[in-house]
């Protein structure tokens, strides 16, 4: 019964990762497309060529994943027909990096409205988001590939270290963009945040040491996680998570938070411009249905030794009982579980930070309709700082077509060739982009896959603006 309850909790953690948008280290061609209103997400100071914009539900869909080094082709040996024939854990262990990063993102913007005022552009946006990432070191893969025989001696432990950070929330953003002078533009957005779910690891590590003389196994582990999940989950009298079977929508608004986006854009002349931006600077205060999970080696009998699990082997008689007596085997396995307890408990309020993003960009306009850009970007994730360097070209044709090509370099990821296309038809802008064309042909062997599509409506036509010969946005006649 307890295992069934635990499975439900694990399922909830996975769902919290999958639902919404994970703002991982994704650089999208949308960020550079001058006709796409959603470029303002990366640069709130940009002067959009529109009088007004609106979208409901269909404005922005985003799907993607990040995987620095875990590759399908490295896990298997293949037959002559190219089908997996054998799992090769040692080959897989040799292929991973010292630190491996995984992420997933899927997004929907529920409502967007931009409206130009006398002095600038008012922006309103409501969306559902998650920010999620996981980090795994190579210790677990080395242990599976080579066994404990590769870790003999006190100075040579197998170290398994992992971290997981997932946050699901709603975001209501209100902002303003203004042209301070002909050369300087500023932009900001204030964000009201409403947390839906959070899972964070403070510690998730283990050490396994093999004695050089007796080959006894010594295991030390420490797990500390905290979570805030919807009210459908609670800790029952046995100390395990359980479900109530119903969900209260109002709970989605009981974990408040706040964030800001800030940006400045400066045009040196008609060719050169520069952008600096800080986005997703904020926090969420978790106060509803919080609990923690901890695990340390427990003193449950003969295998406990000064805080460690020490396994010296078992006798022949005991081995025969384990092999032949089902009841004895179940009791023996249950006794081993007592050494590795999972303890759940209610906990107080806590805060988590958003994954703040820093951006520096330089633009060179060859002509008013052809722009080259170079961008340095970095995001502070729960598992560390994730930098990226992007080269981009964006062309505007016939005043209604945008084509954008990007190349992005990230740690352990150098094959990210992106392409974006948008077409403005009367009162709507249809766009389709990806940050990695190669990834669509080899999804299980790519470090990054992303697709972003949407339809945005340009209201109050014919007041839509365009880029004139001087490179400045102007109204259509």
Predicted features along the sequence, with ranges:
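N-terminal, post-signal peptide beta-strand-biased segments of exported outer-membrane/organellar beta-barrel
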Residues: 23-130, 134
